[in-house]
């Protein structure tokens, strides 16, 4: 059979639903089958542009910024607060990016959830040691 979400992704979604605010903002990749957006209804910085293009909506700048924040620690820190980020979700799609900043995030932010290839970092000031 076809599996859209792994067991770890489902566990991460359950954690998000039970432990984050409904209006929490997550930095993730913009894949159309995004775990955070699809399974939890939480907001992400930039979702899939698959349909937006045909409606004339300009999403490319936000899409580029989201990818740069996932791959460049300086860009991440320069935009983290102004974008209003609460969490960073690193899963299979995010790890496929060249240069994803997982080491930087692990060194600077607490891990709120981890299972297999899924890691969620908490960016709240009271969570940061």
Name each model-derived stretch:
Residues 1-129:
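Extracytoplasmic
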